């Protein structure tokens, strides 16, 4: 049974064609008079979604840690080892330990991946203060759930593999950065479509009043409805499948907010 969990993930995502910010920028509108959020937006921050245990409740890196991070990320990009995906760059840069993503077969190197943006936050999650997804009801009391084993090491059947290993879903929204971490937003008067590069998933979100589907119907990416609150697009999503094991898909409702803050940046929160 799902329980309500409350988190706040905040980050700024940038348009692919980013240039210098224009100081006199005014909010753009579509022909229908809606805030214009259309474009291809990239989330390439190096900041992990969940905070590493080593930081406890510390929200920011020290100046020394950030300088070390910048230097090590540059060094890792020049090395010949396997590429580091998602949070792996952050962990390797701070710990000095670089582990292969796929030691059995190897992988392409870092030169094939996008340059990462370095910020001083220790996690994208800012609430709860520990920077981590809250536990499901029961998990805090030591109850364990029957979930597929992470990774693809010696599975006995396809049921032992996670839905991301099986290329079914990486969750919606897809929050990991630096690899397939682009969203394309397309708008009409009645709908917003968010195409996630990862798994090529398209979220078709009505902007018109329409009741949610029956609560007995559960979907990988839930059932979304959207509306505009001033310059902000608000998307409320319910009816997530129990099979969607990603932390932000375990609540009864996800509320996302998209606010364009200049021509090339969008403020996103969940």
Segment roles from a protein language model:
Residues 21-270:
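PEST-like low-complexity, intrinsically disordered acidic/proline/serine-rich tracts
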């Amino acid at each position: 049974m799902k329980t309500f969990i409350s988190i706040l993930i905040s980050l700024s995502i940038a348009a692919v064609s980013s240039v210098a910010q224009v100081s006199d920028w005014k909010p753009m509108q579509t022909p229908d008079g809606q805030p214009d959020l259309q474009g291809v937006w990239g989330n390439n921050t190096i900041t992990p979604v969940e905070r590493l245990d080593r930081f406890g409740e510390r929200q920011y890196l020290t100046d020394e840690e950030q300088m070390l991070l910048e230097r090590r990320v540059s060094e890792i990009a020049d090395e010949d080892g396997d590429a580091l995906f998602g949070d792996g760059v952050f962990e390797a840069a701070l710990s000095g330990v670089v582990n292969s993503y796929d030691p059995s077969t190897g992988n392409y190197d870092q030169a094939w991946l996008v340059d990462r943006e370095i910020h001083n936050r220790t996690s994208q999650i800012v609430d709860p203060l520990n920077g981590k997804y809250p536990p499901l009801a029961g998990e805090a009391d030591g109850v364990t759930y029957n979930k597929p084993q992470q990774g693809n090491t010696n599975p006995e059947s396809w049921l032992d593999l996670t839905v991301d290993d099986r290329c079914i879903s990486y969750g919606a929204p897809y929050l990991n950065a630096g690899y397939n971490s682009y969203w394309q937003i397309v708008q009409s008067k009645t709908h917003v479509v968010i195409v996630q590069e990862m798994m090529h998933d398209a979220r078709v979100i009505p902007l018109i009043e329409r009741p949610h589907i029956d609560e007995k119907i559960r979907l990988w990416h839930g059932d979304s409805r959207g509306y505009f609150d001033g310059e902000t697009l608000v998307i409320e999503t319910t009816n997530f499948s129990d099979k969607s094991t990603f932390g932000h898909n375990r609540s009864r409702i996800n509320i996302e907010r998209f606010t364009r803050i200049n021509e090339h940046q969008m403020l996103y929160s969940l």
